[in-house]
Regions:
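N-terminal accessory targeting/assembly segments
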Residues: 28, 466-510, 514
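Amphipathic alpha-helices that form helix-helix packing interfaces
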Residues: 349-352, 356-359, 376-387, 402-419, ...
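Conserved phosphate/pyrophosphate-binding and hydrolysis machinery centered on Walker-type P-loop NTPases
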Residues: 13, 80, 84, 256, ...
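Basic, polar low-complexity surface loops/patches
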Residues: 1-340, 347-361, 382-389, 451, ...
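ATPase nucleotide-binding head domains, primarily ABC-like/P-loop NTPase cores
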Residues: 252, 256, 522-556, 599-922
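A conserved P-loop NTPase coupling/switch region
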Residues: 44-69, 156-162, 169, 182-187, ...
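Long, charged, glycine-rich C-terminal linkers/tails
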Residues: 107, 116, 122, 278-287, ...
Length: 922
């Protein structure tokens, strides 16, 4: 960020000392809270102390921008300024990406500072107009309040949530949870919670556990007083928010006592009762956790569901980034919601698939929606919210934007009506009938706007009430036109005097600072220098701005008349805005339909434009079916420029191959394989097509993952402890209908302990839970579990190696990997030759040691393999004994016997790994 963009903070000595004294008197704050001070009425901002150093390092990336106030040495306060543009970008990054809190301080009088605005990741109300002014909201900042209770020795979780930025909705839920609170974790994922309000009760064991989950899910924790959860006024408060004709006491949600307690805390935290514009605008909903597939935080990361800061501009690194071809911000928000709320109802999934299929097959309709219609829809929720407040300086412009949406609706409806395929009835129900309803209900709004607003002026980006709507308005407008008619001749006169062609080298312009003025290039600036009739206004990169006394007077007159027109029309504007605000409910409903249409078209677009087009999966009802995928691929990886993706088949069958152990070299594709099955399952339950040639899937109630230790060490948790915590959560929350993904287990402790735990956990899942499970492991000995549990199947990623190199095939095949490729992979990674040689020597030493301590380890071969191999050896030796007696002890004849017997038993030897290895060692 350029230093020249940084404003100068100029304070006299007294003001500087006074501010420093005030600043040092402020209470301490967490590092994750930034204090920003408004300067010159909001023209620019300043930050101080640690916050200034943060800005210098992260925004300007230089300490040269730091200025010290209040003296020198330890007494000095490091300070830094931000232009308004930079401050807005800084706020957006702090709140939406860094998940920091913000305090914006404003000055009253000469030296009385107070907090003017507070904002946090889940409560953006105070700053949303600032940070979203030129940017639509692509994420939903949800804040949730939670309270735990116990009944009949069971843990109950009550929660209430709200999104004040993109929806006017209060949601509540209450459910039983286990001692790892895995259902609560799933709730955080499903709702995309950014901030959680909890009671400040210290020493509560369950509360500490709850906070640990919040931290794992990157949710900001806000503590409030225990009394804020009091429900004394909850009925009247909620009734005021819901509006007339609705009584919360008659709703089933009112009986959820824990949830109502959380609703009380949430209403107080968000200050909903103190803002009349909220009253009568909210609806209450009940969130049913069981309607959607449960995801834990580890699964969200394992499946690359949402973008991470490391992705940068590479959108295809996450599933959201890959699928987000939406043309509207409301579509992007709904896509995020759908990805975190995969459906459990087969009819609902099939209905979505049918709609996606329409746009998948009809190229013309898909292109028409994306290129001609959807891109023209603004965020109607934000527009409705601004209109309800009614105090926006751009209120008339917002009304016009709503009007432009209304007049486009018939075109959208006509484009959709062209479809005449097998899903026509569903198409009619989901889109066409709803659009007809919106067109009918919004017709009076269209008529009112056309009657009251000067739509011709809109073409010149002017937003005003029609002059003929009021006599005084008409008179003022006539005077404005008279002045405007004199402006052009004055500009033409100047052009003639200077010998420059108007609109070529001489420009006639208007802006908010200088009004009407002229501009010529800096090369031609000499033509007006030292000539009194020309008044220079400013020199810019684009040229020199100037005026004349006549032009200045005309511009001033026009400005005054325009101001009078604005004053006269202000009451009419209020009436128009108030009228349009009554349609907010219809606009919100339309917004939801547009978002749904946008996501479905996006699903179809991505499905058809993938390197290999996706196909529609077949799903069975919950509790039935298998996972059979033909040539499945990872949708994100196949989009990478430098990747030629190898597709793999998948076969998870009930009673046959429920628990699959995948062995093979690092970097060989184990992790990708198990993750892509999770991704395909999630996509299918979202209603999207999947990256497979064919796909048969069952409905999973959850995807649970144990992958990598991540940044656990940064939180004071060892790798092993992180593994055990995640695995314990899986064991407690998994069901027969879950999909479990385990990518390595037991690496954080000794080899023998790690193997023992991996074996015990695998056996428990395979025999007790019996969920479909994919376990990628470096413990090759774990494959022996298939001899004890018939539903365990062994797979391996194929690799070809010789003494010098390894070729990773990325192909998953049945059977076990009987060879370690660690040193080969290190060679691929260009490790120094000395390190490689030392590794080989140490590996050889360990192999010798392993020979001596083999009885301590699980057998390398199954009992059946050893028995079959021994039988082959026994038969071979019996035949050799018989045939060798006929060779009379001659060496040449003996070799012929051996060769003949080798050919006889070649097929059996090749099919038994125990014999093959024995021959290699011989």
């Amino acid at each position: 960020m350029a230093d020249k963009e940084r404003p100068e903070l100029s304070l006299d000595k007294g003001a500087e000392q006074g501010f420093c004294s005030f600043f040092k008197s402020l209470p301490q704050k967490p590092d994750t809270t930034i204090r920003i001070f408004e300067r010159n009425g909001g023209d620019f901002y300043s930050v101080h102390a640690e916050d200034a150093l943060y800005v210098a390092q992260n925004i300007y990336q230089t300490s040269a921008v730091i200025k010290y106030l209040g003296g020198e040495g330890a007494r000095a306060v490091p300070s830094c300024t931000l232009s308004k543009l930079n401050a807005v970008a800084f706020l957006r990054d702090l709140l939406l990406s860094k998940l920091y809190r913000v305090e914006i301080w404003e000055i009253e009088g000469r030296s009385n500072w107070k907090i003017g605005k507070r904002a946090s990741p889940g409560n953006l109300q105070a700053v949303e107009d600032l940070i979203f002014r030129d940017n639509d909201v692509s994420t939903s900042p949800v804040v949730l309040a939670v309270k735990l209770g116990t009944k009949n020795e069971q843990i109950y979780v009550g929660a209430a949530y709200a999104d004040t930025t993109t929806q006017r909705k209060l949601g509540v839920t209450e459910f039983v949870d286990n001692d790892t609170l895995s259902n609560f974790e799933s709730l955080l994922i499903q709702l995309s919670v950014k901030e959680c309000v909890v009671s400040d009760e210290a020493g509560n064991y369950e509360l500490k556990k709850l906070k640990a989950i919040l931290e794992r899910c990157d949710v900001v924790i806000t503590e409030c007083k225990k009394g804020d959860f009091n429900t004394k006024d909850i009925e009247q408060d909620v009734n005021r928010l819901l509006g007339e004709g609705v009584s919360v006491s008659t709703m089933p949600e009112f009986d959820l006592k824990l949830a109502m307690s959380c609703t009380a805390a949430l209403i107080k935290y968000l200050g909903l009762m103190g803002d009349d514009t909220f009253h009568g605008q909210y609806i209450m909903e009940h969130h049913d956790l069981s309607r959607y597939m449960r995801l834990d935080a580890a699964a969200v990361k394992a499946l690359n569901l949402m973008p991470s800061p490391q992705d940068g501009t590479r959108k295809n690194m996450s599933l959201y980034g890959l699928l987000n071809k939406c043309k509207t911000s409301q579509g992007s928000r709904l896509l995020s919601q759908w990805l975190k709320q995969p459906l459990m109802s087969l009819p609902d999934i099939v209905a979505r698939q049918n709609l996606v299929e329409v746009f998948y097959q009809d190229t013309e309709l898909r292109q028409s929606m994306q290129e001609d219609h959807l891109k023209n829809f603004p965020d109607l929720h934000r527009l409705a919210k601004k209109l309800q407040r009614g105090n926006s300086s751009s209120a008339l412009q917002d009304v016009v934007r709503v009007y432009q949406v209304v007049i486009r609706l018939p075109g959208v409806k006509e484009a959709l009506e062209v479809y005449d395929g097998k899903y026509k009835e569903l198409f009619q129900e989901e889109f066409i009938q709803k659009l007809e309803h919106f067109i009918e209900n919004l017709a009076p709004l269209q008529e009112m706007v056309e009657t009251t607003i000067d739509l011709k002026a809109v073409e010149m980006h002017e937003f005003r009430i029609k002059p003929d709507y009021d006599p005084e308005l008409q008179e003022t407008r006539q005077k404005m036109e008279e002045v405007r008619e004199q402006l052009q001749p004055e500009a033409e006169r100047v052009a003639e005097c200077l010998g420059l062609e108007l609109d070529k080298k001489l420009k006639f312009e208007r802006n908010s600072v200088h009004g009407y003025h002229l501009r010529l290039t800096r090369n031609d600036a000499g033509k007006i220098r030292d000539r009194k009739e020309y008044i220079e206004l400013a020199t810019q990169k684009a040229g020199v701005l100037f005026t004349t006394s006549t032009l200045r007077k005309l511009s001033q007159s026009f400005h005054e008349l325009q101001g009078r027109y604005g004053t006269l029309q202000s009451n009419f504007v209020k009436d128009v805005v108030a009228c349009v605000a009554t349609y907010c409910g219809v606009l919100e409903a339309l917004n939801q339909v547009v978002a749904q249409l946008d996501v479905l078209v996006s699903f179809a677009y991505v499905s058809i434009h993938a390197p290999t087009p996706y196909n529609r999966p077949t799903l069975s009802v919950k509790g039935q079916g298998n996972v059979i995928l033909t040539k499945s691929r990872h949708p994100c990886l196949e989009m990478q420029d430098d990747v030629s993706f190898i597709a793999n088949d998948v076969s998870l069958k009930r009673g046959e191959s429920e628990f699959q152990i995948i062995t093979g070299p690092n970097m060989g594709g184990k992790s990708t394989y198990i993750r892509q099955i999770g991704v395909v399952s999630l996509l299918a339950q979202c209603g999207c097509f999947v990256p497979c040639d064919e796909a048969e899937l069952c409905i999973f109630d959850s995807v649970l993952a144990r992958v990598g230790a991540g940044d656990s060490q940064l939180k004071g948790v060892s790798t092993f402890m992180a593994e055990m915590l995640e695995t314990a959560s899986i064991l407690r929350s998994a069901s027969l209908h879950s999909l479990i993904i385990i990518d390595e287990l037991g690496r954080g402790t000794s080899t023998y302990d790690g193997f023992g735990l991996a074996w015990a956990i695998s056996e428990h899942i395979a025999t007790k839970i019996q969920a479909f499970t994919l376990f990628a492991t470096h413990f090759h000995e774990l494959t022996a579990l298939s001899e004890q549990v018939p539903t365990v199947a062994n797979l391996h990623v194929e690799a070809m190696a010789d003494d010098k190199s390894i070729t990773l095939m990325y192909k998953v095949k049945p059977g076990i990997c009987d060879q370690s490729f660690g040193i080969h992979v290190a060679e691929l990674a260009a490790f120094p030759e000395k390190v490689i040689n030392l590794a080989k020597r140490k590996a050889a030493e360990l192999e010798d040691f392993d020979t001596e301590s083999a009885e301590l380890r699980p057998p390398k071969y199954s009992k059946q393999e050893v028995d079959d191999g021994s039988k082959i050896v026994e038969n071979f030796l019996r035949d050799f004994s018989r045939d060798a007696s006929m060779a009379n002890g001659e060496e040449e004849e003996m070799l012929k016997v051996v060769e003949r017997l080798r050919e006889k038993y070649q097929t059996e030897i090749h099919g038994n790994i125990y014999i093959r290895d024995m021959l290699v060692e011989l």
